[in-house]
Structures are given as C-alpha cells and as structure tokens.
C-alpha cells in the first residue's frame, strides 16, 4: 500500500465497488465467508494488476453473496484479465468471454460458451461441458 499513488482514492474506489462500507471497522477474521472473499479480492486489486486469478471465488457463498460477487466481476471485465476457475456451469457461462475445459489436468477445449454448445450440438452449456469432458460418454 505504501507505493500506491493516490492510495486513499484507490481504497475509497474499492470500498465503494465492493460495498465494504458497513464492515470497514471490523477485523477481517470476524467477517462472514462472503465478506472475507469480497475483501480479499478488493485487496488483490489495490496495485492495479493486469491479471487477476480467482480460484472458485463463489465456493460456499449463499446465492445473494454469489450474485454480488458476480456483479463485481462484471464491473472488472474489460479493465483487467480475469482467470477464474469454477465448478458452477452457470457461473462459467455467465461471467466468461471464453471458457477452457480441463479433464485430468489437460486443457481439452477452448471457446465461447456458445461456440462450445454449437460444436457438440448441445442444448445448453452444462450439456456441452458434460459431452466435452466425458468425450461424449455420459
């Protein structure tokens, strides 16, 4: 935080983006899982990274906290590159410009959700994922 130009402005921007005003005076360890997740992502953005890695950022969050985090991720799209891992197909489809599907540690397919649906003749993204991940052997 010491070498950040306009650090107070940046902190205020992140507090507003993540709606952290109501928990500013609390210690991080006393926050719920959702608030802790939002705080950790906000902290990771303080130095204006070009790439942000999010490993299952909504795991264990309730529906409302998950949607709030999705909203923040949507706000970040186009400003930085986000690499996000998830087991939730709805999340991958909703938040991603491009999706990479991995199986047994190997990247086996990359494309937009719609490209992947079309490629395997699926009715929806989850069906496309299953067909690709299993090699068509459901």
Predicted regions and their residues:
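Conserved ABC ATPase "signature" region
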Residues: 6-23
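Conserved ABC ATPase signature
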Residues: 27-34
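Conserved catalytic motifs of ABC-family nucleotide-binding domains
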Residues: 48
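Catalytic Walker B motif of ABC-type/P-loop ATPase nucleotide-binding domains
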Residues: 52-55
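Conserved H-loop
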Residues: 79-87
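ABC ATPase "signature
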Residues: 110-111
